[in-house]
Every structure is written in C-alpha cells, then in structure tokens.
Amino acid sequence: MYEVSRVRVSGPLAVHVSGLVGCLAGRGYGSKSTVEHVRRLAQVSRWLEREGLEPGAVDEALVVRLVGALHSAGKGRSLAPRSFRVLLGFLRSQGIVPSERVRVLTPIEVLLDGYRNYLVVERALAAVTITGYMGTAGWFVSEACANDPCRVAALSAADVARFVVGVGRVRGPRSVNEVVVGVRSLLRYFYLKGLIDRPLAQAVPWLARGRMATLPRTLEPGVAGRLLASCDRGTLVGVRDFAVLTLFVRLGLRVGELTAMEVGDIDWRSGELTVRGKGGWRDPLPLPVDVGDALVAYLTRRGPSGECRQMFMRIRAPRGPMAMTDLRAVVRRACARVGIADTSTHRLRHGLACDLLRHGAPLFEIGQVLRHRDLETTAVYAKVDFAVLATVAQRWPGSES
C-alpha cells in the first residue's frame, strides 16, 4: 500500500502536503506517484530546516545541491534533479516560491528573441516550425557571425553561400533544404529590421532536388481500417484513440491540427468542423457522420474537463491536453497492435489522398480535402495513379505491348 500518511514530513513545507496531494489527484496521479512526490517535498523541507532557509529559497540550484548531498551520503543513488520538477511546479503555482529567475540575455540572445517574436506574431507559424527555424538561426549566427550581433551588418552573399555549402557537407538533401528555408527566413527578418542593407535571402543557394523526384510514402489498401479496428472501444483510452485515428484517416488532418483542436471548433447543428491549420488559417470542413460519431462517443465517455477546451486529453497523469508526441504515440501503438512497421501521422494523410485517387476523385478535389494552398502541392499524387499513367505511357521500343 502507498499511503501519504506513512511519509514523515517536517520543516517549513510540512503544511503544504495536503495541497500537493490535492493538486496531484486533480492531475490524475495515482497513489504510488503521489507518495513519491510527497517524499520529494519531505526531502526539500528537511534540507530547508537543516540549513535554516525559508521556502522562498527553493529553486533548481538548491535541488542540485540537495541531490548531490544525498548521493555523497550514499542515499538516493537513482535520484536526479528532474525528479523534483513536479514539486517545483506546484510550489511556484501556489506562490510559495518565486517564479524562475529571469536570466539576463546576451546580445545574440536578444537578437534571436526578436526573431522568435517575429515568427510568432507576424508570421503566425506553428510552434514546431518555430523550433526548427530557431535551431537554424542559432546555427547560422554561430557559424556566419561568430555569435556577434555586430557582425550581422557585415554579412555578405559569400558568407551565406559558405554556410549553406558547409551544411551540405554534414547533412542530407532533405535536411539541407530545411536549413535553406530557415536561413532565408532569418535573412528576410534581418533586412526587414534594417540589420542588413541588402536582401541577402536571394543569395541563399537552393539544393538541386526536384519536388517530383520521389513518390509520396503511403499505406497499403486496408491498413487504415485495421488500425481503426485495433482500438479497444470498451475503454476510454480506446475510444479516444479511435477518434484520433478517425480524424487522421478520414479527414487527413495534420498532427498539429489535432493538437490545436478545441471542443468549440465543432458546429454540431451545421455538421461542420473548423480546422486550425498552418499559418493561422481556419478552414471549415464538412463533418462526416462516422467522424462525428467517433467524437461524440469520446466526448461522452470523457466527460467535462474543467476549463480546458482542448479536444484530446491525456487519460493518465499528468492530465492535460495531448501534445504532438502523445498523438504520434497513438499511431505508433496502433501500428504495433496490427503488426506493421511504425508509420508517421503524415503517411495517414498521404493514404487518404491515394484512397481518394483510387476512387476517381480529381486532383483539385483532393487538394480541397487536404487544404493545399497550391495545386502544385497536390500534383505529387498524380505519380501514384498508375492506371491513368498506363494510358499515356509510351511503349518501350521493340516491345510487343
């Protein structure tokens, strides 16, 4: 049995045990996990008492010292500072300890922080896209500017080309093109803010790689149905996972769009779903009956989730909105259940497009379903319509058919 009452707590944090227990219960933590976090509180509280410190002194540095002292005493060998994150979060949320101290940014960090704000506010990019762009930006200013903001104004086309060529030596073609896109974005920002006096984004070389050079990676016919059938709809997790997979398979939604989906995005009277897409776009889609049924079953089983408006929630602790990694894990588990290789959520999107193509849907309709802004993006699926391609293929010289 795991009972909180068995944990001896003394010191200035002892009065907060009940608050921590209530917070953990509200987030779905079980008795075993709750007891472990109360033990962390007891360790910190005893340390404060021994050192004569107030609760406000608790921070990451104190935790590191505490863990080091325990290790030196031969205790808690498996204990790490990250084990105290939940406790620190609780203490800060209650105002018991101050928020994380704001670190003074270096000049180059100030520059990159301005770029991040530009991506968020003016470009309205998704969080995952911003993360990729910021990684490229940090790499570029480190290599091309030696982490010195004063050298940004002196950037030349040769510096830009030299950086991209260097990336090409250590990265594959797909990764290089992602870096190229990020560097172009950063240089456009520099020019927009007057940090450089020439539009150097035009000097970024592209890697020669045709958009139509590869086939879209899709699913074999029938696999999508097997993934859906693998969900145990007798459980809340199974009902939720079935709804998630249904949206991937039937509407071809992107994983970020499922993450952003809120309960209020569905207009049940008109049978319409508003998708929060890339670039801040909001696209209305008709809600098929089977998709609506899957969502109704999940929401009915899930019940109210307090003030949180997100559609998909974690069932296990810590409860809260599902992140992209959680949604990808739903697909990964389904693949394991049906005995197929792990597949990406985007391959389910490709699978929908190819299935529509097999049933005679024209490319422009497929583009509407997938919400492509450019028909050229949809044109890649023409390469997998083998029946149509066979009618226009030239016979090989000398062949009989």
Residue ranges and their predicted role:
Residues 1-401:
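Conserved catalytic core of the tyrosine transesterase superfamily
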